[in-house]
Amino acid sequence: MLLADWRAAFVAMPGHKGLYGPQGTGLLLCGAEASPLLYGGTGSASRRQTMPIDLPDRLEAGTHNMPGIAGLLEGLRFVSHAGVERIAQWERRLTRRAEEGLARLPGVEVFADKTGQGQTGVLSFCVKGMDCEQVGEELARRQIAVRAGLHCAPLAHRTAGTLESGTIRISPSVFNTEGQINFFLREMREILRENTKKSV
């Protein structure tokens, strides 16, 4: 990946999403001309008031998260070995299966790329008449991990028109199976059925 190809001075990315690293890790790609905003506590040359000239020391202050770095390295190795396109195809397949199944459920609104071209392994949805946190809790009781709310992305929710309600988000990965997606859809159907009975 070349920054020049992206016409960007910096590219930042989380390590715990598609790279399968631990939470709290990430990557910051920057050109050689990048300079620190503040100086002090260099980590590798603590007696100096200024950061070292050589990269990466110039941009690395303090104590490094070595366990996180080691975990991220293993995630990168896994992705490299498994193949980015192979992982992406599987995630899209599972996401498409979840999208099609959710779209058949009454009162469920799915937020997805209608063309399917830009859809990634992340899918958000809402349930009419149910708070998204309530749906998330019901799924958690059934051993299904989702994220409910604004997902640290209020601007995306403003664009989607879900800033007030939030959404429920699923993120199928290379470690999930079609059977697990089918289980998720069955449990969603049951949650909706139970909610309908309560509201009658």
Please describe what each predicted stretch is.
Residues M1-V200:
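Pyridoxal 5′-phosphate
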